[in-house]
A protein has these predicted regions:
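N-terminal assembly/interaction segments in proteins that build large macromolecular machines
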Residues: 1-181
Length: 181
């Protein structure tokens, strides 16, 4: 609906022009006007402003279903290759929906929970029964490491090159443009 798209643009314009960092009455009023006109229930749940530092680029991606949108900021260079990498990171996040940026951000309680799940799976696996305890511990550690790599953005295999992680791709792009990203 063109009215809905126009409202989205107007909401963005007002948010940036007035420096809003949370949903304001003005947002609600604008929504109510259109909701009344098109008879749809709409709301803005939150407003987030992403500031891009001087030596950085940003990219956005909105999936074709208009339900998934991603913003990425890459610091260190404004080179076109970095802009493309930022866009590719957006595609990656939309496709793989990482839960965390890095493994440092994963709560210990989550790791403990997953450890218990893997221990339970291993206890029910007949092949594991005959293995020595140190081998079981190594397998458990490997399962946890693999799982963390799957849920952490920087450790995931890159969407456009599944032979390297996001971190490795970032290093490759950084080297190509002569910058630490």
């Amino acid at each position: 609906n063109s009215d809905f798209i126009a409202l989205g643009e107007k909401l963005l314009d007002v948010t940036f022009a007035k420096g809003y960092t949370k949903v304001e009455k003005e947002h609600q009023d604008m929504l109510l006007d259109l909701a009344t006109k098109i008879r749809e229930n709409m709301s803005v749940r939150r407003v987030c402003v992403v500031e891009v530092p001087a030596n950085a680029v940003s990219a956005t991606y909105v999936h074709s279903d208009f339900k998934t949108g991603v913003i990425a900021v890459v610091k260190g260079s404004t080179d076109d290759q970095v802009k493309q990498f930022a866009y590719d990171c957006c595609l990656h996040m939309a496709a793989f929906t990482p839960a965390y940026l890095t493994q440092k951000e994963v709560p210990q309680s989550y790791i403990d929970e997953q450890t218990e799940i893997f221990k339970g799976q291993m206890a029910n696996d007949e092949k594991m029964a005959s293995k020595p305890e140190n081998v079981k511990q190594g397998i458990l550690k490997g399962k946890i490491s693999k799982h963390l790599a799957e849920i952490c953005f920087v450790d995931q295999m890159f969407v456009k090159d599944d032979k390297m992680t996001v971190t490795a791709k970032m290093a490759e792009v950084g080297k190509a443009v002569g910058a630490k990203l």
